[in-house]
Regions:
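Catalytic phosphate/metal-binding cores of nucleic-acid and nucleotide-processing enzymes, i.e., regions
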Residues: 6, 77-79, 99-103, 131-140, ...
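Active-site-proximal beta-strand elements of phosphoester/diester hydrolases
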Residues: 2-10, 122-128, 219-221
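Active-site neighborhood of divalent metal-dependent phosphoester bond hydrolases
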Residues: 45-48, 53-123, 130-131, 138-154, ...
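Residue-level marker for buried hydrophobic side chains located in beta-strands
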Residues: 5, 31-33, 60-61, 123, ...
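Conserved beta-sheet core of the metallophosphoesterase superfamily
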Residues: 184-250
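N-terminal active-site segment of His-dependent metallophosphoesterases
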Residues: 1-50
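Active-site environment of divalent metal-dependent phosphoester hydrolases
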Residues: 10-14, 39-42, 66-70, 131-132, ...
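Divalent metal-coordination and catalytic microenvironments
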Residues: 8, 36, 51, 63-64, ...
C-alpha cells in the first residue's frame, strides 16, 4: 500500500494515466492531488470519472479551478467569476458539467475537497498563503472544505479570484526562482505552513521540473500537465510523487528522487 501525490491535473487524462502506469499505481494504493482537476486540458470528464471511481483512495485539496467548478455545479457562480473562469481555461469544464448526468454526485464530490490535508509526515495544500490571512479563519484549517470555505473568512473574493489565498509570492522566495536573493527564512516568517513537516503544493506550473527547496521544506510538483508545445512552447508533464520513498516520475518517463533535485 503506497501513497502517491499527483500535481495539478487540468483535464490531462492521458498524461495522468501514463504517469500512474510508470509509478506502478495499484488497486491498494492511495492517490492524493494538489488540486485543479479540470480546465485547460482536453479530457476533463475522463479525469473526473476516473478519480471518482477511486472513491476513498483519492484525496484532493481545493484548487482555485475547483472553486469555480463547484460554484458552477452549485449554481452560485457570479458573472465576474464565470468570466474569470472562462478566461483561465474553464470553457471545456463548463461544457462537461453542463451536460453531466450525475450532477448531484459530482457536486458532492467537489464539495468534500478540504483546504488542507495534514498527515503525520507531510501536508498537502494547493499553494502557500500568508499567515496573516490564514489566522483570520473562523474555522480550523483542517475542517475547511469547499462547502464551508466561504464562511471561514480566509477567502476574500469567493465570486472571482482570490490572489491572496491562491498565492505565488511566497514560493518565489525560493532559490529555484531567485538564485541571487533567495529568502527562505522570510518565506517561513510569512507562512506558518513552512515548518519541519514537508509541505507539498501545486498551482505554480514549473517548466524546469519538480521544485524541492529543503531549506523552506516545500515541494511543488505541478509540472504543467496541460501544456502543449504548440500553445505554450513547452510540452507539459504530469508528475506523481511517492511520498513514502520520495521518488517521483513524470509522464515523459523522467524519474528521480527529491533529494537529487533539491535546491542547494
Amino acid at each position: 500500500m503506497s501513497r502517491f501525490i499527483v500535481g495539478d491535473i487540468h483535464g490531462s487524462y492521458d498524461r495522468l494515466m501514463t504517469a500512474l502506469d510508470l509509478c506502478k499505481f495499484s488497486d491498494s494504493d492511495t492517490l492524493y492531488c494538489t488540486g485543479d482537476i479540470g480546465d485547460r486540458g482536453p479530457d476533463v470528464k475522463k479525469c473526473i470519472d476516473f478519480l471518482m471511481s477511486l472513491k476513498d483512495r483519492f484525496k484532493s485539496v481545493i484548487g482555485n479551478h475547483d472553486v469555480w467548478a463547484y460554484q458552477y455545479l452549485s449554481d452560485t457562480i457570479s458573472r465576474i467569476s464565470s468570466d474569470t473562469w472562462e478566461y483561465n481555461g474553464g470553457r471545456c469544464t463548463m461544457s462537461v458539467l453542463y451536460n453531466i448526468d450525475n450532477k448531484e454526485e459530482v457536486t458532492e464530490w467537489y464539495g468534500s475537497f478540504p483546504y488542507i490535508i495534514e498527515e503525520d509526515d507531510f501536508r498537502l495544500v494547493h499553494t502557500l498563503t500568508y499567515t496573516k490571512k490564514l489566522e483570520r479563519s473562523k474555522i480550523p484549517l483542517s475542517e475547511i472544505t469547499m462547502r464551508n470555505i466561504d464562511d471561514s473568512d480566509i477567502i476574500d473574493n469567493f465570486f472571482g479570484y482570490d490572489s491572496g489565498l491562491f498565492n505565488r509570492h511566497i514560493l518565489y522566495r525560493s532559490k529555484y526562482f531567485n538564485e541571487k536573493f533567495p529568502s527562505p527564512q522570510l518565506a517561513k516568517e510569512e507562512c506558518f505552513l513552512l515548518d519541519d513537516k514537508l509541505t507539498v503544493i501545486g498551482h505554480t506550473p514549473l517548466t524546469g521540473g519538480v521544485l524541492y527547496d529543503k531549506e523552506m521544506n516545500v515541494c511543488d510538483i505541478d509540472t504543467g500537465g496541460f501544456c502543449t508545445y504548440k500553445q505554450h512552447k513547452y510540452e507539459g508533464k504530469i508528475t506523481v510523487l511517492n511520498i513514502d520513498t520520495k521518488d517521483f516520475v513524470d509522464s515523459s518517463g523522467f524519474s528521480s528522487n527529491l533529494d537529487a533535485v533539491q535546491v542547494l
